[in-house]
């Protein structure tokens, strides 16, 4: 908790519109993180959802209930044809039938961070650390960057899948990570709320 408070204090500001970004999908984890950051830690989060190709009615209902309870929320729908193409190639090349969406829940969120000048991004838990996986970040390291995302979560297939998709830059906008220069200027910090519990 001490480490979390130190991180939050660095980003908490009455002068900024948003202190951090949280990712929400209509499930319990993102809602829990966003609620705690706003109410327990007095942060002003911008909740972001990346729409998948298929949505469940329950997930949509839960997300609407969450937003209606008093949160600023941005719902992004990346080009759905591009999503289908990336999902198909991701399935054949990487074994992930939802690979396009997996890319977008990282790349689109980071694009929002750059566009809104919000350097702190929270995901709920780190499946790689919680359930076993790529341990390069290390169990004692809470904050990470794009290299960890493209390695651990996208299993080093990100560039290959985007190239094989043969899609236009416009179609790929929400699927491409911001440039290294943009991220360096922002001083991006990505973390998981679960790391601090």
Cite the ranges covered by each PLM segment.
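Short, glycine-rich nucleotide/cofactor-binding loops
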Residues: 21-29
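Hydrophobic positions on the alpha1 helix immediately C-terminal to the Walker A/P-loop
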Residues: 32-33
